[in-house]
Amino acid sequence: MAEITAALVKELRERTGEGMMDCKKALTKAGGDIEKAIDDMRASGAIKAAKKAGNVAAEGAIALKEDGKSAVLLEVNSQTDFLALQDDFKAFVAASVEKAFADKLTDAAPLIEAQEADRLVLVGKVGENVNIRRLVRVEGDVVGGYLHGNKIGVAVVLKGGNVELAKDIAMHVAASNPEFLLPSEVSADAIEREKAVFLSLNADKIAGKPENIVENMIKGRISKFLAEASLVEQAFVKNPEIKVGELAKKAGAEIVSFTYFKVGEGIEKPVDNFAEEVAAQLAAAKQ
């Protein structure tokens, strides 16, 4: 019998929309054969919500739980923004982040398993696909977080300073979404890509200019890029006269890390074509 790995269970869950435990049982019964497991689940009527499970859940909410020394950021997805505003969904999100924080979870997998029964009840009640997508736990000397509505969440870890400062920096991150903490973290590839973009966009301005002038123009653009992309080099949103790194230093603090979550980030949303959908339905009706 093939080994029932977590990856195999995850694949079956993604293909059927069923719970992790149900998928594990089906795979065990099928001897690790995923196609047989799917056939068995279909034959037994276990895949009742296949249509819902196939729907992309790219809306939802970000939840944050913190205590000054640690924080949990959690993303739970729904199919529509409307559901994300409903009490049943909010209650599920709140219960999930509370459990993740209390159990000191550092990964979404155990939370998904623990909340699966409640998730299925919610899906059955609201008629939409709902998924716990990702979870991050951070710990440190000083930890502060910020939620922008329920769509963006940030957790900042400091060495020194205080929670209020961490929260202020987290708010800045939510507004500015830096890619890196320090300029030194920016990869050579990222710098080369920025250089290529600059040269492409400014081909007319550069044409005919001496090489040393072009090099200075490139250096200026790269310096600006590093400042825009690095948290410590960005102008603080509440006081643009000071950089975020300087703000922390004046408070006797060092920014250790930041974590940024935005609802649906990286999820490819389907683009519905109403005309094609109607045409397909009419064609099916004629058959």
From Swiss-Prot:
GO CC aspect terms: cytoplasm
Q: CDD domains attached here?
A: UBA_EF-Ts
Q: What does this protein do?
A: Associates with the EF-Tu.GDP complex and induces the exchange of GDP to GTP. It remains bound to the aminoacyl-tRNA.EF-Tu.GTP complex up to the GTP hydrolysis stage on the ribosome.
**Record's subcellular location:** Cytoplasm
UniProtKB keywords: Cytoplasm, Elongation factor, Protein biosynthesis
- GO terms assigned for molecular function: translation elongation factor activity
User: What protein am I looking at?
Assistant: Elongation factor Ts
The UniProt annotation puts the region (Involved in Mg(2+) ion dislocation from EF-Tu) at 80-83
Keyword Disulfide bond carried by entry = no
Family per UniProt? Belongs to the EF-Ts family.
Source organism (scientific name): Pseudomonas fluorescens (strain SBW25)
Coiled-coil zones: none
User: Pfam family of this protein, just one?
Assistant: EF_TS
Q: What is its main location?
A: cytoplasm
Q: Which InterPro entries does the UniProt record give?
A: EF-Ts_dimer_sf (IPR036402), Transl_elong_EFTs/EF1B (IPR001816), Transl_elong_EFTs/EF1B_dimer (IPR014039), Transl_elong_Ts_CS (IPR018101), UBA-like_sf (IPR009060)
